[in-house]
Amino acid sequence: MRSQSRSAALLGAAKALAPAGVDFHVFDRHGELPLFNPDIEAALPEPAMALRDAVAAADAIVIVSPEYAHGISGNMKNTLDWLVGHPPFVFKPVAVFNPAADAHHADESLKEILRTMSADLMGDACVRIPVIGAGITSAADVVASPMLAAVLVSAWQAVVCHVEGIRARGEAAVRVVFDR
């Protein structure tokens, strides 16, 4: 995961543009997760426990992930594998902020994985934000772009509306974001 990637810029902009009242936390320990192995699930490694705890504490999850060779990164897949069958992830509201307008292979693959995991994909909050190829190199560049900022603000509104709807129904603040 590159700290200066365009996905990191989008993640930083998402944090900067998060609505008031949104408690926004980034899970940045992907590199510490061992390769998923169901044989070691009984003695859960600490980074995997931290991931699961973060997901359990979240009302919604926002994923920012690049496309690699027409797919999601191995790191993202490994992170998701640690959540397969984890009850707090099931029906968890999830938004996907895709940093490339034309990265449809990874975008669709990620969404299919999330649907298989029984995530509650928030359609209006799953957006492609064309950071790649737009001369964007930082979160400030995204925030300064009226078009890109508007897409993010709209996606955030969809996240908040969805979470508020869940709360109004008496079911389960937006807390966890992962991958760069």
Located regions from the model:
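N-terminal beta1-alpha1 ligand-phosphate binding loop
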Residues: M1-G21
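Short, glycine/serine-rich, charged loops/turns that create anion-binding
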Residues: M1-R2, G31, A101
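A general structural signal for well-ordered alpha-helical segments in protein cores
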Residues: S7-L11, A48, M76, A106-D107, ...
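A generic structural motif
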Residues: A18-H25, D120
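N-terminal beta-loop-helix "entrance" segment that forms/cooperates
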Residues: V26-E46, G135-A139
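Helix-loop-strand module that forms the ligand-binding subsite of alpha/beta enzymes
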Residues: A43-S118
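Glycine-rich phosphate/pyrophosphate-binding loop and the adjoining helix
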Residues: M122-R180
